[in-house]
Amino acid sequence: SSVSGKLKLRFLGNHDTVTWTFDAQRAQTLYGTEKAKALWMMLGWIDGVLYIYQGDEDPAAYHLEGENLEAFFTDLIAAKREYLPNTLDTAYLQTGSAVFACRRFGEQTSRLVLVNLSDTETPYTLTASASVLTALGNVTLAGNTVTLSPYSGAILQEG
């Protein structure tokens, strides 16, 4: 239930989560780098605005431990800007697996967002023809099956 003309703020961490909850851990420390990246893909590619808490992109800038993710966030945000404008509606799809799926669509566009939230390679069966527009991680399309490596994601053009 969205308010017309307003965008949702999507985040894995903020000043509250690193001071009051999760034993003051950031997403990369709490979940591990690859799991956190998959969660950021999911949140970044659905409707709304992705909020990256200071230090999540480069922990060293705040004297914290963790992998520098500036290139990952650059690619994630570039994909959102190019393929998933906030003018598109969102429909969440039931997959019966560890693959998160949603359709982002408008009058002339239908895009499928897939993110593998597991540590195993996972297939997703398409219900319509599609082509991969961009992927973060190893993603292959063969016939009507998209295979996603652990914690990877893709945006597909349907039709």
Model-derived regions, located:
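C-terminal beta-strand-rich structural cap/linker in extracellular carbohydrate-active enzymes
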Residues: A142-G159
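Aromatic- and carboxylate-lined catalytic core of secreted/periplasmic carbohydrate-active enzymes
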Residues: M41-G96
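Active-site/binding-pocket entry motifs
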Residues: T17-V18, S131, A154
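Solvent-exposed beta-hairpin/edge-strand motifs
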Residues: T127-N138
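A residue-level signal for conserved active-site and pocket-lining positions in enzyme catalytic cores
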Residues: H15, L76, Y151
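Conserved alpha/beta catalytic core and glycan-binding cleft of carbohydrate-active enzymes
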Residues: S1-H63, G106, L117, Y124
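Carbohydrate-binding surface patches
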Residues: P59-A60, G66, L93-T127
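A residue-level signal for beta-strand positions that form part of recognition/binding surfaces
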Residues: K8-L9, V99, R111, T145, ...
